[in-house]
Amino acid sequence: MVLGRGSLCLRSLSVLGAACARRGLGQALLGLSLCHTDFRKNLTVQQDMMKIELLPALTDNYMYLIIDEDTQEAAVVDPVQPQKVIETVKKHRVKLTTVLTTHHHWDHAGGNEKLVKLEPGLKVYGGDDRIGALTHKVTHLSTLEVGSLSVKCLSTPCHTSGHICYFVSKPGSSEPSAVFTGDTLFVAGCGKFYEGTADEMYKALLEVLGRLPPDTKVICGHEYTVNNLKFARHVEPGNTAVQEKLAWAKEKNAIGEPTVPSTLAEEFTYNPFMRVKEKTVQQHAGETDPVTTMRAIRREKDQFKVPRD
């Protein structure tokens, strides 16, 4: 990430926010953390069936407004800054009906209560009773609709025990679908194992998300791409896909543009956590089994000192 005005604030809050995400202290920091994201640009992913507005939040989070083009009904993913969501809803002149919460950490679910006060009657979905303002608890393969869009809930426990990813598609459409992965799968990375194991993350990445169509758009919860790719380069220094993606991501960061979305097919070429079956990744980890490789490279990533280049 390029840090300009307020860079000290951003660095401090990035570290502090990660700790608070699992300690329940986020609400006390929410107002402070808006200091801020205005150097990061919104992005609209436009398709015939749906429009997805990427909304930067806090220091490196993303919220997402999903608009069904047929009905102009909308859902929002992880609305930690409710006022920004409301402004975007008004800009697009759509009807917000649904909140999709990936997990209970404050930087994802911390805006739910305020949003439902601003917009009474919202349906709030999630897989964990710790999620604020929850109205509909979902489990693996639960389904719901947003206008004419179909949403399938995918249980991916590990970062948190109740983590849900949301696979959004349009029945009968040939356009690529999208999966909102929260803190399970990032561009070139994955979430920390706060409440789970390497085996659970392996299943989440390879057996649940990895079996979705290859052209599925991966839409994640944070802008971590450059740092993730620097670790991927460390794991596989000879991987040209990593090198090319890193150069591209640095250019995007330099002008404040998102590196999201990627696709599942792309993730299998440069994401070391999706590549734990590859010999190059296993050799780096000193392992021969994908799950123990997952455990080893996650531990290494947790201690990795990101180079400044």
Curated annotation (Swiss-Prot):
Binds 2 Zn(2+) ions per subunit. It catalyses: an S-(2-hydroxyacyl)glutathione + H2O = a 2-hydroxy carboxylate + glutathione + H(+); (R)-S-lactoylglutathione + H2O = (R)-lactate + glutathione + H(+). One of its GO terms (biological process) is spermatogenesis. Zn(2+) 1 binds at residues 103, 105, 159, 183. Substrate binds at residues 192-194, 222-224, 298-301. It comes from the Eukaryota. InterPro entries: Clx_II_MBL, HAGH_C, Hydroxyacylglutathione_Hdrlase, Metallo-B-lactamas, RibonucZ/Hydroxyglut_hydro. Zn(2+) 2 binds at residues 107-108, 183, 222. Pathway: Secondary metabolite metabolism; methylglyoxal degradation; (R)-lactate from methylglyoxal: step 2/2. The keyword Cytoplasm applies. The modification N6-succinyllysine is found at residue 230. Belongs to the metallo-beta-lactamase superfamily. Glyoxalase II family. Monomer. Thiolesterase that catalyzes the hydrolysis of S-D-lactoyl-glutathione to form glutathione and D-lactic acid. This is Hydroxyacylglutathione hydrolase, mitochondrial. It comes from Rattus norvegicus.
